[in-house]
Amino acid sequence: MNSAFASNDLSILMLSSAGQLDRRPDSRDGGISTNMSKRKSFDVEGLGHANPIPAVSRIGNIVATGGVSGTDTSTGKIPDDVAAQCARMFANLRTILGAAGATPEDVIRVTVWIARPEIRAEVNKEWVVMFPDPHSRPARHTMFYDHFAGSMVVQCEAWAVIDIAAGHV
């Protein structure tokens, strides 16, 4: 058995952005690594949650949003119009990603929840506006959800990986 992977060894082998293995102490042994990233949470004015949940969190170059709705940030209200909700949702996603230093080009996965099947067509219209290159779109999964609050009919969340090597911080 390779001693680097012995069961009593409480280290984690991490793959660095340069593709190198980096040995870091496991938190179970109380070890602290100055190289290990810490989570940062970001709130975005007009897009807060009623619960103590940030709009977006980031560890190193990984970004994850909370739920992103089609709230109109100037009024704080959800538009009644489905097309307007979808357009605002993607605009809000761009704003939320930006708070953590990410852009739509960094997005690797989006999950969308819709109240009714016909909403998918409106999501698709805004999807191709935000991600116009058919050869460089993030993965997406769309699911039906029937417990939205008020007039909300669409919501999404996204994961992004920031290209630190390209100078994005």
What are these regions (language model features)?
Residues 1-7, 11, 16-17, 24:
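Low-acidity, Ser/Thr- and Arg-rich intrinsically disordered low-complexity segments
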Residues 10-13, 26-91, 95-108, 114-169:
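N-terminal presequence-like segments and the immediate start of the first folded domain
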